[in-house]
Design a protein with these regions (language model features):
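C-terminal regulatory/interaction regions
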Residues: 111-183
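Hydrophobic helix-cap positions at the C-terminus of alpha-helices
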Residues: 7, 72-75, 158
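A short catalytic or substrate-binding loop motif that flags glycine-/basic-rich loops and adjacent residues
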Residues: 1, 20-23, 170, 183
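Conserved hydrophobic "DFG−1" position in protein kinase catalytic cores
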Residues: 8-9, 29-31, 166, 178
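Alpha-helix-centered segments that form part of catalytic cores
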Residues: 1-10
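Active-site/binding-pocket entry motifs
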Residues: 7, 44-45, 86-87, 129-133
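Conserved beta-strand positions that form and line the central face of beta-propeller blades
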Residues: 6, 18, 175
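Metallo-beta-lactamase
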Residues: 13-107
């Protein structure tokens, strides 16, 4: 289904809205007349969706996701019908929470790089995770892998914004640092 396609389902019309980030081809379906958004994994009520976790990979998955969240805010507010979790009254309210979360995570990531943590793994270990503020070593293995992937995505956004630089080590690892001209 192409972005912007209206699907006439007799009793309602759903507009397909391309929202890459969780996956490259993710779509939400907005029913403006009924003020409902079928959000899939784009906006979840209690957790942040995993970003760019697919075999094809997308180095800029977080940038795409943040743009998709902004695009969601540009639509009229609607009840949120997510793929996981309860229906909530406002898509916009949850989108604003997700944007605030990622702003905070970007700041924490930048601070960790400022503190000398250079690889996505090192940065992930320097940050607390989940709403319970758990240390990296307290996470199960799958969550650790997801945390390193999320950290790499945040580092890529900081790189595009000019807040960090990236070099490749002789072993092929990505090494990030804050530019000298930046505090």
């Amino acid at each position: 289904v192409a972005d912007g396609t209206d699907l006439d389902l007799r009793t309602r019309t759903l507009r397909a809205v391309h929202t890459p980030g969780h996956t490259l081809g993710h779509l939400v379906y907005h029913d403006a007349a009924s003020e409902i958004m079928f959000a899939g994994d784009h906006v979840l009520p209690h957790i942040t969706p995993s970003i760019g976790f697919e075999p094809a990979g997308n180095r800029m998955a977080l940038r795409d996701y943040l743009s998709s969240l902004a695009r969601t805010l540009a639509l009229p507010d609607a009840r949120l019908l997510p793929a996981h979790g309860p229906v909530t009254g406002s898509t916009h309210e949850r989108v604003n929470e997700l944007l605030a979360h990622h702003d905070l995570r970007l700041a924490e990531t930048h601070q960790a790089v400022l503190g000398g943590h250079a690889t996505p793994f090192e940065v992930a270990k320097a940050i607390k995770w989940t709403r319970r503020q758990r240390l990296f070593d307290e996470l199960d293995l799958f969550s650790q892998v997801m945390s390193v992937n999320e950290t790499a995505a945040h580092l890529e956004v900081l790189l595009v914004r000019g807040q960090v630089t990236r070099e490749t080590s002789p072993t092929g690892a990505d090494l990030y640092q804050v530019p000298v001209s930046q505090p």
